[in-house]
């Protein structure tokens, strides 16, 4: 399907684990799946001449959909409001996505687990854009990357009812 099509176009690296060569994609499949589902569910069908879009670059993937979000981008982790509730319900029934308000949480958890830079969520020209970055050395991350990672980690811990400490960060 669509997820496999996008995964097949992502840049990849080879790593050696336990003496076995393994191909690693720029970003994990769970991230692509959740962001594609969000782009489809939350698009504004009233805007004409535009549709969800996936752009693949050497260092990042940008998945966008038409329309400005109903919830501010800094509340994507803990807020939920869909403009297409019937479509969201249908996609949950078909197993394309899970319960409400869990997709962005999964994206951020996957990025943290794999030590990827924190995803960025933007609103540009009546489009909502999710940017997920490939691996980046901590020394090369700028201040905004680090602040975004701290903020998202803090909110995610709160949503999951976990304590945030220096060790969890």
Segments predicted by a language model, with ranges:
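C-terminal regulatory or interaction extensions
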Residues: 1-168
